[in-house]
Amino acid sequence: MADIIETPVSRRLSTVKNIIIVLSGKGGVGKSSSSVQLALSLLAQSPTNRVGLIDLDITGPSLPRMVGLDTPTATVHQSSAGWVPVYVDQGRRLGVMSIGFLLKDRGDSVVWRGPKKDGMIRQFLSEVRWGDLDYLVIDTPPGTSDEHISLLTHLHPLFTPTMSNATTPTSILISTPQTTALNDTLKSLSFTRKLSLPVMGLVENMAGYVCPCCGEISDTFGKGGGEAMAHKEGVGFLGRVPIDTVLVSLLDAVSKGEVLGEGAVEHTSDEAAEGQTNGSTEHFPLLDKYLETTSSKVWKDITQKLVDKIEQHKSDIRARLESSSETLAIA
């Protein structure tokens, strides 16, 4: 079995155990907030987990604001080993990379054609010093555009697993229950199949509104459409997430700097700048506040299902590689 083709991207990401690409067929379905919740839920699974979060929406970056890093102090540092992501917490367990950190004015628009976007995406993948990561979550723009093609082109060498490294990029789909959103989700699913990107499942977001007064659930955008589509298309259904007013208030507070306070973590040494951590479990305000929401409990179950599916996917790959090796040996 051939080894993974070595490229600047494959070398840089060799210390990343799992890559999860978050996709949606259309905008406004809560994909970016889902990416943030997935990252936080992965961190909550273990105090030693380290997660990276890439904002691949070049023309409309939103992750810095969602994690409380939309501040002048949140800037990308250059270390001896490459760009350094901006860390959300003192323990440097959650690092974020976004073009939003590179703009002189956070209100500036990014008017780029495909080739320039491709160059930035390549830099995000090959020049960011993540260190050892358990998970790298990549939040993509809605639809299927230049960004998606560039991403999968640069990740292509990682689609050739070996016995020593069965990790390949995987993805999840985010949709709301309405027919329009689901139709666009089918297009994203078709895209993943054409490019052989494994889909671990679908999340039905905004699936009901929980009244904060009486607790009654109203199916504002319909119900069950995502689950029905997932079953029909043979895609795992990971769960449905209702609208959580507490989460909305939390994200608003985070964007105003009322949760993190000081904002981005300052890098005081080259070791710290390169993302090294001693595995400490220091105070993590954003994670602590998030775990108080109803959404965190829903995403806990979704994340566990996703992790189980990823591990099964890797196990299946190893089994196929072993079977192939045995066949070649007999021949």
Curated annotation (Swiss-Prot):
One of its GO terms (cellular component) is cytosolic [4Fe-4S] assembly scaffold complex. ATP binds at residues 25-32. It holds the Pfam family ParA. Its main location: cytoplasm. The keyword Nucleotide-binding applies. It comes from the Eukaryota. The keyword Cell cycle does not apply. Its cofactor is [4Fe-4S] cluster. It is found in: Cytoplasm. GO terms for molecular function: 4 iron, 4 sulfur cluster binding; ATP binding; ATP hydrolysis activity; ATP-dependent FeS chaperone activity; iron-sulfur cluster binding; metal ion binding. InterPro entries: Mrp-like_CS, Mrp/NBP35_ATP-bd, NUBP2/Cfd1_eukaryotes, P-loop_NTPase, YlxH/NBP35. Gene3D superfamilies: P-loop containing nucleotide triphosphate hydrolases (3.40.50.300). Keywords: 4Fe-4S, ATP-binding, Cytoplasm, Iron, Iron-sulfur, Metal-binding, Nucleotide-binding. Binds 4 [4Fe-4S] clusters per heterotetramer. Contains two stable clusters in the N-termini of NBP35 and two labile, bridging clusters between subunits of the NBP35-CFD1 heterotetramer. Belongs to the Mrp/NBP35 ATP-binding proteins family. NUBP2/CFD1 subfamily. Component of the cytosolic iron-sulfur (Fe/S) protein assembly (CIA) machinery. Required for maturation of extramitochondrial Fe-S proteins. The NBP35-CFD1 heterotetramer forms a Fe-S scaffold complex, mediating the de novo assembly of an Fe-S cluster and its transfer to target apoproteins. Heterotetramer of 2 NBP35 and 2 CFD1 chains. HAMAP family: Mrp_NBP35, NUBP2. This is Cytosolic Fe-S cluster assembly factor CFD1. The gene is CFD1.
